[in-house]
Regions:
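Central regulatory/effector-binding core of bacterial HTH transcription factors
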Residues: 1-42, 111-112
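Residues at or immediately flanking beta-strands
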Residues: 8-12, 105-109, 156-158
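Conserved functional loop/turn residues at catalytic and ligand-binding sites
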Residues: 10, 24, 28-29, 48, ...
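Short helices/loops that flank or line small-molecule/ion binding pockets
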Residues: 14, 19-29, 96, 100-102, ...
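Short loop/turn segments at beta->alpha junctions
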Residues: 17, 71, 113-114, 132
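Beta-alpha-beta core module
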Residues: 42-48, 52-53, 57, 116-163
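Flexible hinge/capping segments at coil-to-helix
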Residues: 44-80, 171
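Secondary-structure junction motif
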Residues: 80-102, 167-175, 182-185
């Protein structure tokens, strides 16, 4: 939508994790950020742009792969491939918090920094994991995506900006376009 309206605008994107965006957003060095829900300082404003289910990933030859869905309890009993807590992704807090709310602490077999690495390691048979449904676009024959039984297994993505630093006209238009997209698609 934004690209169609403003084809000559070059958007400089920086791929960083949630934690790495908070200070630059607060200081006005970043105009906008897309973050998974996390604790934000009072200097930042946000609006939810996406709410999506979390899905389980299991190796294709795993017994759970034959099930139509899976519980958090069943996943927590398996070796877990998960985010490194030092990387600072909002998904780490989302997923671990969900498991803990249901009284589960996963046995973490492998910690990595990127979701794509998690997908590859699950496909290689090193464990199970959980990621948002938007990652389901990655289809590998060695793994299977499964719905999670618990209805509150969801993740949100937020558009975040500074409350105290004025945004340029194009950043404001981009924000308006993204929020209009959200209204159309939610």
């Amino acid at each position: 939508m934004f690209r169609q309206r403003y084809p000559d605008v070059h958007i400089l994107t920086r791929e960083t994790n949630t934690r790495e965006q908070i200070v630059p957003l607060s200081e006005g060095a970043l105009d906008l950020g897309l973050l998974r829900n996390t604790q934000l300082p009072d200097t930042l404003a946000w609006e939810r742009v996406l709410r999506e289910p979390l899905l389980a990933m299991v190796p294709a030859d795993h017994p759970l792969a034959r099930q139509p869905s899976v519980s958090l309890a069943a996943l927590a009993r398996e070796p877990f491939v998960f985010f490194d807590p030092h990387v600072g992704t909002g998904l780490y807090d989302d997923i671990l918090g969900l498991l803990r709310r249901y009284g589960h602490t996963p046995v973490i077999a492998q910690e990595v920094g990127e979701a794509m690495t998690i997908i590859g390691l699950v496909a290689a048979g090193l464990g199970v994991s959980i990621l948002p449904a938007s990652f389901q676009r990655v289809q590998l024959s060695e793994m299977r995506w499964l719905p999670i039984d618990e209805q509150d297994a969801v993740s949100e993505m937020w558009l975040v900006w500074s409350k105290h630093h004025e945004q340029g006209a194009l950043a404001k238009r981009f924000r308006e376009s993204l929020l209009a997209w959200k209204t159309e698609h939610n």
